[in-house]
Amino acid sequence: MASVLGSGRGSGGLSSQLKCKSKRRRRRRSKRKDKVSILSTFLAPFKYLSPGTTNTEDEDNLSTSSAEVKENRNVSNLGTRPLPPGDWARGSTPSVKRKRPLEEGNGGHFCKLQLIWKKLSWSVTPKNALVQLHELKPGLQYRMVSQTGPVHAPVFAVAVEVNGLTFEGTGPTKKKAKMRAAEMALKSFVQFPNAFQAHLAMGSSTSPCTDFTSDQADFPDTLFKEFEPSSKNEDFPGCHPVDTEFLSSAYRRGRLLYHTLDLMGQALPDRSRLAPGALGERNPVVVLNELRSGLRYVCLSETAEKPRVKSFVMAVCVDGRTFEGSGRSKKLAKGQAAQAALQALFDIRLPGHIPSRSKSNLLPQDFADSVSQLVTQKFRELTVGLTSVYARHKTLAGIVMTKGLDTKQAQVIVLSSGTKCISGEHISDQGLVVNDCHAEIVARRAFLHFLYSQLELHLSKHQEDPERSIFIRLKEGGYRLRENILFHLYVSTSPCGDARVNSPYEITTDLNSSKHIVRKFRGHLRTKIESGEGTVPVRGPSAVQTWDGILLGEQLITMSCTDKIASWNVLGLQGALLCHFIEPVYLHSIIVGSLHHTGHLARVMSHRMEGIGQLPASYRQNRPLLSGVSHAEARQPGKSPHFSANWVVGSADLEIINATTGKRSCGGSSRLCKHVFSAWWARLHGRLSTRIPSHGDTPSMYCEAKQGAHTYQSVKQQLFKAFQKAGLGTWVRKPPEQDQFLLSL
C-alpha cells in the first residue's frame, strides 16, 4: 500500500513538474509576444518586401484579431526606437520599444517598397449612399423630376445637384430613386468605401466638405502630400523615406484603409508610340491617358431607354475643356469622350474609332467647326458684314452639302433665321403663308426648294446639266441621291423643345460651372407658343385642331423643332410630295452651336423612336452624327426679331418673311410656301409621269397629292403611334382645311 502511495506521489510529482514547466513556457511565450505586440499592432497593415535577396535569421508568424502579419526581418539591421506615447497598444507600457528595419546599402533609410493598408474588422460600418453624400456635401436638395410608367409599376426620377452637375436616379420608389441619384453623385468624386474613410485618407476627419473632384490631391496635410521623391536614394531610386509623423498619425486615427502606393516615378509618355502609324487599334482612353494622365470621367446620366437597354453619358475635362460621349455602356461612352478630346486637342484620329453609324454618333470636331464657320461666314456675306438690319437674329440655321467628309468641297446650300410662328388669325386655306418661321424649319423648307431645283436640273435639255444634278435615275423608276452626297444641319443653338428644355447642362470650360435646367416631362412631345417663344408639353389626347376654333381665338398649335427634326430622322427631309419622285433624303449630321448636350440630343433625336418597328424599303431610323462646336456663338440678348430670313443657293439676296403673318414684308407669298411648292410639283409630275411608278389618277388637290404618297403616310402613322406607345404624347396636327386647295400650274 505504501509502495503504491509512494509511486502515486512520484508520478504526481512528475506530472506537477511537467505542468509547471509548461506554464513557465507559456508565460515566457506570452511575454515574448507582449514585447512585440506593439510592433505587430503597428506594423500589421504594412508589409515590407526587399527588392533583393536577404538573409532571414528569424521569422515570427503572429496573428491579431483581424489580420495576419508575416514579417521578414534582417536582425543584424534592426535598431530600437522609443514608441511615442500616443502609439502605445492596448495593455502596453511606455517602456516598450519598437524595432525599425533598415535596408542594407540604402544609407539607413526606411524604405517604402510596398505599403499596404488593410481594413480591420473594427473599422467603421459602411453607410448607405445617402448618408455618405450628406456627410460630404450637407444641405443638398433632392427634387422629384418625373413619374412615368403605369399605375401598378411606376418609375420615379429624382435628381440632386452636386458641384454644379445634376445626377438623376430612377427606381420603382422615390426612396430607391433618391438612393440611386446619391450613388451616381458619389461615384463622380469619391474613391473610397465610405465617407469617413475618405476624410481619413485625405487627412481630415472633421471637414465633411472636402472636394474630391481632383485626382491629384494638393490639399495640405493629406495622404499623398507626405510622400515626396527623395534625391538622397541614389542606390534605390524607387524607394522614398517614410515620414514617421505621418505613420504615427495614421496609426493614432485607428482606421486603416487599403491602398497600394506606386513607388516608381511617373514616367513620361512615349511620344513615338503616339505616332499615327503606331496607334493602330488602340483604345482612345489609353491614348489620352498617356498624353494627360490622371483624368477623371464623370457619369452625367444613366437612362433606360427600354427594358434592359441603357444609355450612359460620360464627360471628361482636359486642359480646361469639357468633352463628352454617350453609349450603351460606360466604356463606350468614355471611349467617345476620349476620342473627342484627342481630335480637338491633339488632332489624333484612331483608325478603329472613326465615328460611323454603327460605332459612334459623334462627328469629328474639326469637321463640325468647319461647317459652323461656313454657315456663319455665308450669313455675314449676305448681310454685308452683319451691318444689315436683317442680320439681327436669335437662331441661325443652315444646311451644308459635302462629298464624303471633305470640307474642301463643302457648299452652303441654304440659310435661315427666326424664332417665331404666325398668329392664328393669319392662317391660309390656299397655302399662301409659312406657318412656322423658326430657323430650323425654314432651313428645311429652303432645302425643299433646293431639291426641286435639282430635279429640274436633271431634266434639263443641256447635256451637262444632268451630270451637275445631285440625283441619278433608278432602273425601276424614280430618282435617288448620288453616292457620297451628304447633308449637314447647323443650328446656332439647341432646337426648341425637349432638346433645349431638358438638356442637363450647357458645356463650359469648367464642369463645376455648368448650369442645369429643371427636367420635367423629359422626352415628351412639346408644342410652340403662338406668336411667342418657348414650348409647352402637349396637352390632352386631341390630335386635330379645328379651323373655326382657331379663327374664333383658339391658340394655333405647332410642334416643336426638336420633335420635327426627330420626325425627319424617320420620314426624311423631302416631305410627302417629293416622295412621288425621289427616295427619302436624310441628314448625315447635326451640329449645335450652344445649349447642347450630345447624349440628350441623341436620345431625343433618335432613341425615342426605338419602338417604331420594321420600316418599309428605302426608309430607316436615321441616327445622324452629332457634335457641338469648339467656340459657341455668343448669346444674343434682347427680344427676338419679328422677321425670318432665308436664302437658297442660286439666289442673289435674302428673302425676308414677317413671322407674324407668314408672308413677305411687301405682302406677297414666300418662295417657301405650300402654294409655290404645289405648283412646282404639278409641273414636275407632268414631265415625270412616265418615269415614275403610277399611283392612280393624277391628283387635283394639294391634300390628294400628299395622301397619294402611300408609303410615306403609313410610315408617318407608324411614327406617331410609336410616340404614343412610349407615353410621350400625341402629335398635334394642323386643321385639314389648310391643305384643301387646288393644284395650279
Curated annotation (Swiss-Prot):
Entry keyword annotation includes Metal-binding: yes
Organism superkingdom: Eukaryota
Subcellular location: Nucleus
An annotated GO cellular component: nucleus
Gene: Adarb2
Keywords: Hydrolase, Metal-binding, mRNA processing, Nucleus, Repeat, RNA-binding, Zinc
Positions of the UniProt region annotated as Disordered: 1-35, 50-104
Functional note: Lacks editing activity. It prevents the binding of other ADAR enzymes to targets in vitro, and decreases the efficiency of these enzymes. Capable of binding to dsRNA but also to ssRNA.
Name under which the protein is recorded: Double-stranded RNA-specific editase B2
Coiled-coil blocks: none
Pfam families: A_deamin, dsrm
Record-level GO BP terms: mRNA processing
